Regions:
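A cross-kingdom marker of C-terminal helix-rich interaction/assembly modules
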Residues: 1-209
């Protein structure tokens, strides 16, 4: 099994778990959190698609992992943290290890928009990944607006701390789109033609949603 195949399998595990989480949270009316998992689902599918076509993707995933390790180690050492001498030394060793491996240029960050274009998932990036970042993942006015009602007519403005189904349909539709795309890529890439007919039937059902 190649590194790309291994990572694609792991990404599919994350895709599946995030997809299931979207459904469970949407059923409870927790749309903000459901959309946060929609972004996670979309991100994993973008990665799977990029792994199929871009031989540099496994190395980029390693580099982004090391970039996060480097930033955290620097933050712990330079911040106002009560680190023990042993813990501080551990962070210095991480920094030394990564600098020795990558030199002054350091590890690279993944450009997910570019990878989505490479892997044929640009629409998924815009509709699911990017939109869910604005109204689900991050604390923005769009996210906070879900908890407030302006009031209509004589009704007073009020807080809405109760289940939300304002864009339930599109959230589930986009989650299904991401999941079906992942299955399409993997059945083709891993040579699983026995599942093509079942997948086509699922896609037709999705189109009727």
């Amino acid at each position: 099994m190649t590194d790309a195949h291994l990572l694609a399998n792991l990404c599919f595990g994350r895709t599946l778990q995030s997809f299931q989480g979207v459904i469970l949270l949407a059923e409870r009316g927790a749309l903000v959190d459901a959309r946060a998992l929609l972004r996670s689902c979309a991100e994993s599918v973008i990665a799977i698609s990029a792994l199929k076509v871009d031989s540099s993707m496994p190395q980029l995933l390693r580099e982004e992992h090391d970039l996060h390790r480097l930033k955290l180690a620097n933050a712990l050492l330079n911040g106002d943290h009560a680190l023990s001498a042993e813990a501080a030394n551990d962070q210095r060793l991480i920094i030394k290890e990564i600098k020795a491996q990558y030199g002054e240029k350091g590890p690279r960050r993944i450009n997910w928009e570019a990878k989505a274009k490479d892997g044929g998932t640009a629409d998924l990036y815009t509709i699911a990944y990017r939109q869910a970042s604005i109204d689900g993942v991050h604390l923005t006015l769009s996210t906070l607006g879900r908890y407030f009602a302006d009031g209509a007519g004589d009704a007073l403005p009020s807080f809405r701390f109760y289940p939300d189904n304002s864009n339930l349909d599109s959230t589930l539709f986009d989650a299904c789109s991401a999941m079906l795309h992942a299955l399409g890529v993997l059945t083709d890439w891993f040579g699983l033609p026995e599942h093509h007919e079942e997948l086509r039937a699922c896609i037709e059902d999705w189109k009727r949603m």
